[in-house]
């Protein structure tokens, strides 16, 4: 436990930021999983494209604001795009 008042404040701030970061990353995981579920279920391509766009939008936002590394955001976008393109060819 912190002994100084400033250390207590930093601990509180750190806990709040940690909770926010976890929530944002969880939202991203949910969006990516939703797209993958649609692909696995054989949903129509327009539905998969909507899920793809929302996941990419979230990835861009988190990458720009440094919640995840920009290269990781780019890599995930590329992976999702590859899944979407292969899904289009399979039909």
UniProtKB/Swiss-Prot annotation:
Record-linked Gene3D superfamilies: Ribosomal protein S20
Top-level division of the source organism's lineage: Bacteria
Stretches the record annotates as Disordered: 1-25
A single GO molecular function term of this UniProt record: structural constituent of ribosome
Family annotation (SUPFAM superfamilies): Ribosomal protein S20
GO BP terms: translation
Bias-annotated ranges (Basic and acidic residues): 1-18
InterPro entries from the UniProt entry: Ribosomal_bS20, Ribosomal_bS20_sf
Gene Ontology cellular-component annotations: cytosol; small ribosomal subunit
Entry keyword set: Ribonucleoprotein, Ribosomal protein, RNA-binding, rRNA-binding
Function: Binds directly to 16S ribosomal RNA.
Family as reported in the entry's similarity comment: Belongs to the bacterial ribosomal protein bS20 family.
Full protein name: Small ribosomal subunit protein bS20
């Amino acid at each position: 436990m912190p002994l100084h008042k400033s250390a207590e404040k930093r601990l509180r701030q750190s806990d709040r930021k940690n909770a926010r970061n976890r929530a944002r990353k969880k939202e991203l995981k949910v969006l990516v999983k939703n797209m993958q579920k649609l692909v696995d279920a054989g949903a129509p391509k327009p539905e998969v494209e909507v899920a793809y766009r929302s996941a990419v939008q979230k990835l861009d936002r988190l990458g720009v604001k440094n919640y995840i590394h920009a290269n990781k955001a780019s890599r995930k976008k590329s992976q999702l795009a590859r899944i979407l393109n292969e899904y289009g060819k399979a039909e």
